[in-house]
Amino acid sequence: MGASTRFRRQSGKVPYNSTAASVIIARFPHRITFGCPRPRGNENGMFDDKIGDLGVTFDDVLLQPRYSEVVPSEVDVSSQMTQRIRLQIPLISSPMDTVTESEMAIALAKEGGLGIVHKNLSVRRQTEEVLKVKRSANGIIVNPVTLNPAQKVSAAAELMDRANVSGIPIVEDDRTLAGILTRRDLRFLEDPDMPISQVMTRENLVTAVGNVTLAQAEKILTEKRVEKLLLIDEERKLTGLITIRDIDMMKRYPRACKDPQGRLRVGAAIGVGDYERAESLIGKGVDVLVVDSAHGHSRNVIETVREIKQNKSWDIDVVAGNVATAEGAADLIAAGADAVKVGIGPGSICTTRVISGIGVPQVTAILSAVKVAQEKNIPVIADGGIRFSGDITKAIAAGASTVMIGSLFAGLAESPGKMILYQGRTFKAYRGMGSMGAMVKGSSDRYRQKGTEAGKLVPEGVEGRVPFKGPLSDYAYQLVGGLRAGMGYVGTRTIEELRRDAKFIRVSAATVRENHPHDIAITQEAPNYSPDVHSGDAG
């Protein structure tokens, strides 16, 4: 094996095909080669290329420690999701109907990651979920929701719930400020048909004219002891809004993932050819679209990506997938994808590999995609197979820029899955988008079975439960803490250095057993390790 190969034998004394061989992954980005023996072909050589190189996944490798002067708390874990979107932590929540809606997306964006709202919703409902995220935190709200004084208070109550706001500026038809209406004004009203003009606050409105910095706004709000500062021009027309809640949020979450207007970033999934959904989401400020398919290396996905990117008026970043080969990544990049999502079948709830016989072990898939993606400076997202924080470190060391999380986030308080009490323990429902329930609800197009009646669907996923883990903030801290620790062991200060410099060693099945706690009965679980995950037992 040449010096350019990704893996190398440690010693010439070990037989080449021995299962005891230890193989080191050399410098990024060359592909894995293990010299897996291939069947002999006939005189025409028709079988010569039937079996490719041996593939590996997360449990098959470990990162080698190196001399380090890096302290884990000092590393920079920010990374590119696309060329225009940089995350402060390299975590993205999966567009699954038991993982990501607005609550999950808000919580993750506050921590510095990004959530992708699933598409098993109507266009209107998915758009509303995106709007909830965009309106949950702002610097200066340039286009706040407003109502007219003649409208009914019932319309105000409905808008507050839908937009997740506690107060609404009231303006005349020409945008002249007339007053403000808050939830407190509606609390004891019995007549829902009463006009807003009879309830709203008209006098002593706290306003500011012209450009106002957030520091100036905070001073005004503190002095006046109010929660909202209305921004107006010289003609008293409403130009924006600043809230004390948003100022407090920016102080509490300084690493939040925000757009140039100070709003939290959010993504949304769409199906192939779903341009109506794409247009609606883009119109409401979504930051990135994910063309979501089980087989991203297909004509319909490629055409969808190309069509969206050629529409210059949309000007939106597009993530496309899923793929598991260099060829798949190359074709999506050629179509205009701003990031490529890698992973076919590694997810805990996915049965694609056993039902269809298709897939590539995840580390090998990442390495293959990165080999071509890096030439175009296109980030790779590792999607699936992440069971521990160490797998995040391995995925990035293999060349991914970020990882997409499903099962680990499904058990969090912010996920939309329902709570389940089973044998005295609390769980949350979790299902694959290829499960029968999810496909019936709307995800059948992801598996190229759109329009198929329920009795004829061929599922590629299962439904189950995962242990309840509490709030995302605590859990994300542990995941990122594991990544920081790994970077400290390897001696890399940034995600880019980890991708470039880390080296792997291939391990045996005995080593995998040795990796986990052994020869002990665990009496107190750690917040970042569950023996249930290792054993595959969900309770």
From Swiss-Prot:
Its cofactor is K(+). SMART domains: CBS, IMPDH. The active site is at 350 (thioimidate intermediate), 446 (proton acceptor). IMP binds at residues 348, 383-385, 406-407, 430-434, 460. NAD(+) binds at residues 292, 343-345. Its EC number is 1.1.1.205. GO terms for biological process: GMP biosynthetic process; GTP biosynthetic process. Keywords: CBS domain, GMP biosynthesis, Metal-binding, NAD, Oxidoreductase, Potassium, Purine biosynthesis, Repeat. It catalyses: IMP + NAD(+) + H2O = XMP + NADH + H(+). NCBIfam families: IMP_dehydrog. Catalyzes the conversion of inosine 5'-phosphate (IMP) to xanthosine 5'-phosphate (XMP), the first committed and rate-limiting step in the de novo synthesis of guanine nucleotides, and therefore plays an important role in the regulation of cell growth. Belongs to the IMPDH/GMPR family. Homotetramer. This is Inosine-5'-monophosphate dehydrogenase.
